[in-house]
Amino acid sequence: MALKIAVVVGSLRRDSFNKQLAHALASLAPSDFSFDFVDIGGLPLYSQDYDSDFPEVARAFKQQIADADGLLIVTPEYNRSMPGVLKNALDWASRPWGQSVWGGKPGAIIGTSVGAIGTAIAQSHLRGVCAYLDIVLMNQPEMYIKHDESRIDANGNIVSEDTRKYLQTFMDKYAAWVRDRRV
């Protein structure tokens, strides 16, 4: 039986390095894994006023998360934190109160940035939010990747053999994590 992974990329940029990373990771996954790249760009800014009349785009987003066996969150780092669009998506799928679809889902966080420490601080902030939402995160390996086109090209192809080995380690552990914990 195929395992469906919801991929949430915290960047809306057309040529996002994190989208490239997400596609590179998907190429390393076991054959029984399928990846659903979830669009978060169409979600309006969350307000509790929506709880009584949930927009269709938010219902569809929540359903994509609910239907997934696992989560892969790929985030850039903006001003030493996660992007607002990613936090907004996390909020939408946790609402209305008591109707979160995140709880118990096995997940992992990874990201890339041009900064020297990659996405270390964004991932730290994101881990706190995910813990509150009861997403069961893989703790190791943590990967904070400094973006470099000699590693992954603009099409999401892994260029460097060292990068392939590095990311394969992540994917192998992630695949085992999801298999062992899927709800």
Swiss-Prot record:
Q: Which Pfam families match?
A: FMN_red (PF03358)
Q: Read off the InterPro entries from this record.
A: Flavoprotein-like_sf, FMN_Rdtase-like_dom, NAD(P)H-dep_reductase
- The answer to whether keyword NAD applies is yes
Question: Binding residues for FMN, per the UniProt record?
Answer: S11, L12, R13, R14, D15, S16, F17, N18, E77, Y78, N79, R80, S113
Enzyme class comes to oxidoreductase
What is catalyzed by this enzyme? 2-hydroxy-1,4-benzoquinone + NADH + 2 H(+) = benzene-1,2,4-triol + NAD(+)
Q: Report one GO cellular component.
A: cytosol
Any one Gene Ontology molecular-function term assigned to this protein's record? 2-hydroxy-1,4-benzoquinone reductase (NADH) activity
Q: Give the required cofactors.
A: FMN
The pH note for this entry is: Optimum pH is 5.0.
The record's comment on cofactor binding reads: Binds 1 FMN per subunit.
This entry's Enzyme Commission designation comes to: 1.6.5.7
Where does the source fall among the domains of life?
Answer: Bacteria
Q: Which SUPFAM superfamilies match?
A: Flavoproteins
UniProt keyword list:
Flavoprotein, FMN, NAD, Oxidoreductase
What PANTHER family does its record include?
A: CHROMATE REDUCTASE, NAD(P)H-DEPENDENT FMN REDUCTASE LOT6
- How would you summarize the oligomeric state and partners of this protein? Homotetramer.
Purpose: Involved in the metabolism of 4-aminophenol. Catalyzes the reduction of the auto-oxidation product 2-hydroxy-1,4-benzoquinone back to hydroxyquinol. Has a broad substrate specificity toward benzoquinones, converting them to the corresponding 1,4-benzenediols.
Q: Which family does it belong to?
A: Belongs to the SsuE family.
The protein depicted here goes by the name 2-hydroxy-1,4-benzoquinone reductase
According to its UniProt entry, this protein's organism is Burkholderia sp
